[in-house]
């Protein structure tokens, strides 16, 4: 039996690099997204952005707020497309309860980290996060610089 050709490249649609810098990430979850047809087409074209995105809870459901998916020009024109509409996150009841408990604690929030393809479905990686103070961000930057410097010194010693 012949194997199917797999597409080369990454399955990642969009990353939220800002979240890793602005927040201290704790527990991570994988959630599905309830999307319409034009949104899936736009994501296949790489038109998604989750930089300023966050998760809210309404009626014991999780919703992705301020996620931007730009419509394609060739998308259907007989209905209005809203690039910033709220999108429902598909999670188990146990996971939603765990996330809501964390948000009710002081200083915690839920932020999306990545959008990616898993098989033929769009998945969103979300994390329970706590906001960093300015001095925490500076410390993270110092640690990152020190790791780079260590790598540089190690490579120089190898020569």
Curated annotation (Swiss-Prot):
Region (Disordered): 137-159
Tagged with keyword RNA-binding: yes
GO biological process, one term: trans-translation
InterPro entries: SmpB (IPR023620), SsrA-bd_prot (IPR000037), SsrA-bd_prot_CS (IPR020081)
GO cellular component: cytosol
Keyword annotations from UniProtKB, A to Z: Cytoplasm, RNA-binding
Molecular functions (GO terms): RNA binding
Keyword Cytoplasm part of the UniProt annotation: yes
Subcellular location(s) of the protein: Cytoplasm
Domain of life per record: Bacteria
Family assignment from sequence similarity: Belongs to the SmpB family.
Cited function: Required for rescue of stalled ribosomes mediated by trans-translation. Binds to transfer-messenger RNA (tmRNA), required for stable association of tmRNA with ribosomes. tmRNA and SmpB together mimic tRNA shape, replacing the anticodon stem-loop with SmpB. tmRNA is encoded by the ssrA gene; the 2 termini fold to resemble tRNA(Ala) and it encodes a 'tag peptide', a short internal open reading frame. During trans-translation Ala-aminoacylated tmRNA acts like a tRNA, entering the A-site of stalled ribosomes, displacing the stalled mRNA.
Entries under HAMAP family matching the protein: SmpB (MF_00023)
Protein name as it appears in the record: SsrA-binding protein
Native species: Cellvibrio japonicus (strain Ueda107)
């Amino acid at each position: 039996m012949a194997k199917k050709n797999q597409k080369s490249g990454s399955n990642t649609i969009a990353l939220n690099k800002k979240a890793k810098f602005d927040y201290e990430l704790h527990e991570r979850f994988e959630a599905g997204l309830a999307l319409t047809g034009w949104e899936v087409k736009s994501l296949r074209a790489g038109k998604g952005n989750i930089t300023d995105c966050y998760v809210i809870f309404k009626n014991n459901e999780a919703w992705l707020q301020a996620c931007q998916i730009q419509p394609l020009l060739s998308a259907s024109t007989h209905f209005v497309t809203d690039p910033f509409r709220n999108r429902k996150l598909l999670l188990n009841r146990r996971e939603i309860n765990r996330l809501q408990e964390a948000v009710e604690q002081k200083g915690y929030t839920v932020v999306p980290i990545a959008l990616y393809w898993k098989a033929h479905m769009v998945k969103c990686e979300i994390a329970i996060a706590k906001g960093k103070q300015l001095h925490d961000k500076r410390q993270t930057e110092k640690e990152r610089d020190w790791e780079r410097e260590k790598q540089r010194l190690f490579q120089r010693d190898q020569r």
